[in-house]
């Protein structure tokens, strides 16, 4: 039996890592074989591209950024995600294609047509079974990440960039309401966990 593919999305500080690890535990407790991965990354090539993409010393054209993201994603699908799903494993990914529409589309201003073409080329009709978008205010996200580590190339962007990213995520959620579940990540930890559990209830039965 094919496994399930769950993705978590949100700006930095939304709590993706925290809730991803809880979700991994939650599913394992219910007898699921779970693989956790991330984007960009997940493969040796993907991790090398991640280092380039996040390096705050790097500058690149927005289209270059998008192409590198989708190149990493193609490898990720081929080497990690699709084989795991075919083995019946449940795959949880910290970000996937919705992030490209939010960051490169909303944030960088790339046309949705170009991103749609890349999406179709790289993954065809393949989509996550469910996407959890953790929606947090930009101020809260900044506050949560301010003292964690040195900011990467994306985290150094101005608030206006993240406003566009957040708006793009919300527009994407309106476009695909059956797949993308918007969760208020400004809530308490327990309330967010309850929302996550409710959002995946239809696929883990």
From Swiss-Prot:
Disulfide partners: none
Swiss-Prot/TrEMBL keywords: ATP-binding, Kinase, Nucleotide biosynthesis, Nucleotide-binding, Transferase
InterPro entries on file: P-loop_NTPase (IPR027417), Thymidylate_kin-like_dom (IPR039430), Thymidylate_kinase (IPR018094)
GO biological process, one term: dTDP biosynthetic process
Residues noted as binding ATP in the record, renumbered to the chain: 10-17
EC number: 2.7.4.9
UniProt xrefs under Pfam families: Thymidylate_kin
PANTHER family: THYMIDYLATE KINASE, UMP-CMP KINASE 2, MITOCHONDRIAL
NCBIfam families: DTMP_kinase
Protein name (Swiss-Prot/TrEMBL): Thymidylate kinase
Lineage start: Bacteria, Pseudomonadati, Pseudomonadota, Betaproteobacteria, Nitrosomonadales
Designated gene of the protein: tmk
């Amino acid at each position: 039996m094919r496994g399930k593919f769950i993705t978590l999305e949100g700006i930095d500080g939304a709590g993706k890592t925290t809730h991803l690890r809880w979700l991994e535990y939650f599913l394992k407790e219910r007898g699921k074989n779970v693989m956790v991965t991330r984007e960009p990354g997940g493969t040796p090539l993907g991790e090398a591209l991640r280092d380039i993409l996040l390096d705050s010393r790097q500058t690149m054209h927005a289209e270059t950024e998008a192409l590198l993201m989708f190149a990493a994603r193609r490898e990720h699908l081929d080497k990690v995600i699709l084989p795991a799903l075919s083995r019946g494993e449940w795959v949880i990914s910290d970000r996937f294609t919705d992030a490209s529409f939010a960051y490169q589309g909303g944030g960088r201003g790339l046309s949705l047509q170009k991103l749609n073409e890349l999406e179709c080329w790289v993954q065809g009709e393949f989509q996550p079974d469910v996407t959890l978008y953790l929606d947090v205010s930009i101020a809260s996200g900044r506050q949560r990440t301010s003292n964690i580590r040195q900011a990467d190339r994306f985290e150094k962007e101005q608030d206006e960039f993240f406003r566009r990213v957040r708006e793009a995520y919300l527009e994407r959620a309106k476009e695909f309401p059956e797949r993308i579940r918007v969760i208020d990540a400004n809530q308490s930890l327990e309330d967010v966990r309850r929302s996550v559990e409710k959002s995946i209830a239809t696929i883990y039965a």
